């Protein structure tokens, strides 16, 4: 560092918010409102079929200490939508402070949302606090997946220091349907070789299907949980299906996630997943 280079904690922090509202107009799902500011963007690519696709993007290229990022999607009554992220999110060394990500989606009565963000990659000394909430109206449902990768195996990265807190929850009528907290820190990483933590694995994902018929999808989901290099299990109860996956690296995990999503959705993944 020299006189022309400010210390890391003095650098400007990234802030962004993107919000999309969909509504049914004359029998079709239409964009009713779009608001975006700072580093957060949202766009609706042209798709084949009646279900719109929303792609959220963090233009800052990654997250570091003090950054603030939020995405919000409102899916109107009787509407269906698919939402994802343009690419994997990366949390870099934090310096001072914690990066915060807030995802808040709402699905109106009888609606449906596929929330399919691409994986989050955590780097050494990263500090990230993320909260994802999906609020379901009466008769609404959703499919949600979250994947986390601890460093890049291809680059020989092994993490020993980070602070990651992740809370995912789905509610209906003010009551929790699913609550998934996850916390990883230096102590957890030091114990990560143990079977009770990660068993030496470095990529993990949780998939949740909530809605009518979710329990019926247990058999088809289990039938494809055979990707080499991935440990996975599925269970179904109380109107939801849960699939948990662990892998040595992000690539086999991504392939397994894509296969399960293919079975549950019955159609191709968003194009950004395929690029």
From Swiss-Prot:
Keyword Chaperone in annotation: yes
Alphabetically ordered keywords of this record: Chaperone, Cytoplasm, Nickel insertion
Record-annotated membrane-spanning stretches: none
Highest taxon of source: Bacteria
Tagged with keyword Cytoplasm: yes
Gene Ontology MF terms in the entry: nickel cation binding
GO cellular component labels: cytoplasm
Places the protein is found: Cytoplasm
Alphabetical list of InterPro entries matching this protein: UreD
Protein family according to the UniProt entry: Belongs to the UreD family.
HAMAP family: UreD
Chain's role: Required for maturation of urease via the functional incorporation of the urease nickel metallocenter.
Quaternary context: UreD, UreF and UreG form a complex that acts as a GTP-hydrolysis-dependent molecular chaperone, activating the urease apoprotein by helping to assemble the nickel containing metallocenter of UreC. The UreE protein probably delivers the nickel.
Name of this protein: Urease accessory protein UreD
């Amino acid at each position: 560092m020299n006189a022309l280079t400010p210390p890391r904690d003095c650098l400007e922090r990234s802030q962004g918010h993107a919000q999309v509202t969909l509504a049914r107009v004359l029998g079709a799902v239409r964009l009713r409102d779009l608001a975006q500011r700072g580093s957060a963007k949202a766009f609706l690519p042209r798709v084949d079929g009646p279900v719109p696709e929303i792609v959220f993007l963090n233009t800052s290229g990654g997250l570091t200490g003090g950054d603030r990022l939020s995405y919000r999607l409102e899916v109107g009554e009787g509407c269906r939508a698919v939402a994802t992220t343009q690419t994997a999110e990366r949390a870099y060394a934090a310096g001072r402070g914690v990066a915060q990500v807030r995802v808040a989606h709402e699905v109106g009565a009888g609606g449906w949302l596929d929330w399919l963000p691409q994986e989050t990659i955590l780097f050494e000394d990263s500090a990230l606090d993320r909260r994802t909430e999906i609020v379901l109206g009466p008769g609404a449902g959703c499919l949600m997946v979250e994947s986390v990768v601890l460093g890049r195996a291809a680059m020989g990265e092994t993490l020993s220091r980070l602070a990651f807190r992740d809370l995912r929850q789905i509610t209906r009528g003010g009551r929790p349907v699913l609550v998934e907290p996850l916390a990883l820190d230096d102590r957890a990483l030091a114990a990560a070789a143990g079977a009770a933590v990660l068993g030496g694995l470095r990529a993990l994902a949780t998939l949740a299907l909530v809605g009518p018929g979710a329990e019926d999808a247990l058999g088809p989901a289990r039938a494809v949980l055979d990707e080499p290099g991935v440990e996975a299990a599925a269970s179904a109860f109380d109107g939801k299906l849960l699939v948990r996956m662990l892998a040595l690296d992000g690539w086999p995990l991504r392939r397994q996630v894509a296969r399960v999503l293919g079975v549950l959705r019955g159609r191709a993944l968003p194009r950004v997943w395929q690029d």
